[in-house]
Design a protein with these regions (language model features):
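Conserved pre-motif I regulatory segment
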Residues: 2-74
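Conserved helicase ATPase motor motifs in RecA-like P-loop NTPase domains
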Residues: 73-79, 202-206, 217-237
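Motif I (Walker A/P-loop) of helicase-class P-loop NTPases
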Residues: 81-91
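Conserved Walker A/P-loop ATP-binding site and its immediately adjacent core
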Residues: 97-132
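Short glycine-/polar-rich loops that comprise or flank the Walker A/P-loop
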Residues: 97-99, 158, 194-195, 219-222, ...
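Conserved nucleotide-binding/hydrolysis micro-motifs of P-loop NTPases
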Residues: 108-111, 166-170, 204-205, 229-233, ...
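Conserved RecA-like ASCE ATPase "motif II neighborhood" in helicase/translocase motors
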Residues: 142-153, 158-214
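Conserved interdomain linker/interface between the two RecA-like ATPase lobes of SF2 helicase motors
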Residues: 238, 242-273
Length: 273
C-alpha cells in the first residue's frame, strides 16, 4: 500500500500526466489548485472574503449562488467530465486530506455509469487507473446503503457517495430519520463531516428549489459543479450561472478535436411522409 508520505508528488502536473488529462481537464485542475491555495477552505466561514479572492482571480465568478463555496467548470459535452471528477478527487485527497465526496448524478443512466467509473477497477473506464494513491479502491456508498449497512466512514481511506438527484429528493425524508447504526440520521452524519465535497454532474439540473435546499442542507466544505450548459431557463429568459470559474465551449472542443461538429440531417424527398 502506498504511504501517505508519497502524496507530495501528486501535483496537478503529475495527476494530469498519469490520468492523461486533456487540455481543458488539466486547466480545470490547475484552476482548482490555484483557488484552493488562495482561499480559506473551511466550513462556516465568511463566504464574502473567499468570493472576493476568487473574483480577483477569475472575474467571471461573481457569486457562489449557494450557502457554501461552489465553483462551476463549464465544459462542452464530450470533453470528459467524469475523468475530471476523478482528477479533482485525487488532488483533494492527496493534497488536502479530503476523504469524503458526495457525487450527484442527473438521472439513472449517468448514476449507474458513475458508480462503475468511480468504484469498479475492472471497468475499462475506471477513472483512477494508474494512481497509486488509490491502491485500495474508494469505498462507494450508493442506493440504499445508508439504510442497510453499518457505515463507519472513519475506517475507509476515502468515501464516495453516489446518488441520483431524483432518488435523493424522494429519499430525503428517510435520510433524515435516525439510523440505528449511526446513532443519528444519515443526513446529520454527512452534514457533520468537516471535509465533505459535493460534486454535481450536469449541475444545471440541481437548481430547482427542492434540490437546491436539500444540497445546501448537507453543509459541504466545497461544491464543484460540472456542466455543458451553465444557465437555467426562467420562462423565456436565460439566466447564466454566476459562479463559473472556467469555460470551455463547444466551439473550442470542436477546434481541438475533442468532439465532432454537430450536423443536422435533412431529406429532400419527403412528399410521401
Amino acid at each position: 500500500m502506498m504511504s501517505k508520505a508519497d502524496f507530495f508528488k501528486y501535483t496537478t502536473e503529475y495527476i494530469s500526466g498519469v490520468m492523461s488529462l486533456r487540455k481543458p481537464q488539466a486547466e480545470s485542475l490547475k484552476i482548482l489548485d490555484k483557488i484552493i491555495s488562495s482561499v480559506n477552505l473551511a466550513k462556516n466561514i465568511d463566504l464574502s472574503s473567499n468570493l472576493s479572492i476568487v473574483n480577483s482571480l477569475y472575474p467571471i465568478c461573481t457569486n457562489f449562488e449557494r450557502e457554501f463555496m461552489s465553483l462551476t467548470f463549464a465544459l462542452a459535452t464530450g470533453v470528459g467530465k467524469t475523468r475530471l471528477m476523478g482528477a479533482f478527487i485525487a488532488y483533494l485527497y492527496t493534497q488536502h486530506n479530503i476523504r469524503n465526496f458526495f457525487v450527484v448524478a442527473p438521472g439513472t443512466t449517468v448514476y449507474e455509469k458513475l458508480k462503475q467509473d468511480l468504484g469498479n477497477p475492472a471497468n475499462p473506464k475506471y477513472v483512477f487507473k494508474g494512481l497509486g494513491c488509490f491502491s485500495s479502491t474508494p469505498y462507494i456508498i450508493a442506493d440504499d446503503d445508508y439504510r442497510d449497512k453499518s457505515i463507519n466512514l472513519a475506517l475507509n481511506d476515502i468515501n464516495i457517495f453516489v446518488f441520483n438527484i431524483d432518488k435523493f429528493n424522494k429519499e430525503e425524508s428517510k435520510m433524515r430519520d435516525i439510523n440505528e447504526y449511526l446513532g443519528q440520521s444519515f443526513y446529520e452524519e454527512l452534514a457533520a463531516l468537516d471535509d465533505l465535497v459535493l460534486i454535481m454532474d450536469e449541475s444545471h439540473h440541481y437548481r430547482a428549489k427542492r434540490g437546491w435546499s436539500a444540497l445546501n442542507d448537507l453543509h459541504p466544505l466545497l461544491g464543484l459543479e460540472l456542466t455543458a450548459t451553465p444557465y437555467v431557463k426562467n420562462g423565456a429568459k436565460q439566466v447564466n450561472f454566476k459562479n463559473v470559474v472556467y469555460e470551455y465551449p463547444l466551439s473550442a472542443a470542436i477546434a481541438d478535436g475533442y468532439t465532432r461538429t454537430p450536423m443536422a440531417l435533412t431529406r429532400k424527398d419527403i412528399d410521401f411522409y
